[in-house]
């Protein structure tokens, strides 16, 4: 069945193949364009550098009018990532726009890695360390980077 959501997702996939943003990749799982696997490489010159972080994206038929559900599968220690892997990111909630595509979502998440929003933390411990003990925060982040290589 061809729906506008599926057509849009196929356009998003084509863009990811022809004009991939640096440090991110994504593609639909076999036989289901509504679920995607994605990878974000930790940005250079940040504590997340060289990490390979896996995510899953779930789209509903209302996409692009409704944002996808996005969740880290890789362990992530970050102020805006819940223990479940779900993200607290404004563009995936109240600041969503149908103009955002998969590439824009993933690059926004990649930017969030080194520029967390500590005013509304999903992980209070990570937020407190980021604010009050940056050395320990970086140590914990580097541990998740090393774990990302094993996955």
Curated annotation (Swiss-Prot):
SUPFAM superfamilies listed in its UniProt record: UBC-like
Keyword presence, DNA-binding: no
Record InterPro entries: Ub_conjugating_enzyme, UBQ-conjugat_E2_core, UBQ-conjugating_AS, UBQ-conjugating_enzyme/RWD
Pathway(s) the chain acts in: Protein modification; protein ubiquitination
Record region (Disordered): 1-26
EC numbers: 2.3.2.23
Alphabetized GO MF terms: ATP binding; ubiquitin conjugating enzyme activity
Gene Ontology CC terms, in alphabetical order: cytoplasm; HULC complex; nucleus
Domain UBC core residues, every copy: 4-150
UniProt keyword Repeat present: no
Alphabetized Pfam families for the sequence: UQ_con
Enzyme class: transferase
Assigned keywords, A-Z: ATP-binding, Chromatin regulator, Cytoplasm, DNA damage, DNA repair, Nucleotide-binding, Nucleus, Sporulation, Transcription, Transcription regulation, Transferase, Ubl conjugation pathway
CDD domains cross-referenced by the UniProt entry: UBCc_UBE2A_2B
Main location: cytoplasm
Gene3D superfamilies xref list: Ubiquitin Conjugating Enzyme (3.10.110.10)
UniProt record similarity statement: Belongs to the ubiquitin-conjugating enzyme family.
Biological function: Catalyzes the covalent attachment of ubiquitin to other proteins. Plays a role in transcription regulation by catalyzing the monoubiquitination of histone H2B to form H2BK123ub1. H2BK123ub1 gives a specific tag for epigenetic transcriptional activation and is also a prerequisite for H3K4me and H3K79me formation. Also involved in postreplication repair of UV-damaged DNA, in N-end rule-dependent protein degradation and in sporulation.
Protein name stated in the entry: Ubiquitin-conjugating enzyme E2 2
Lineage, highest ranks first: Eukaryota, Fungi, Dikarya, Ascomycota, Pezizomycotina
Gene name of the encoded protein: uvsJ
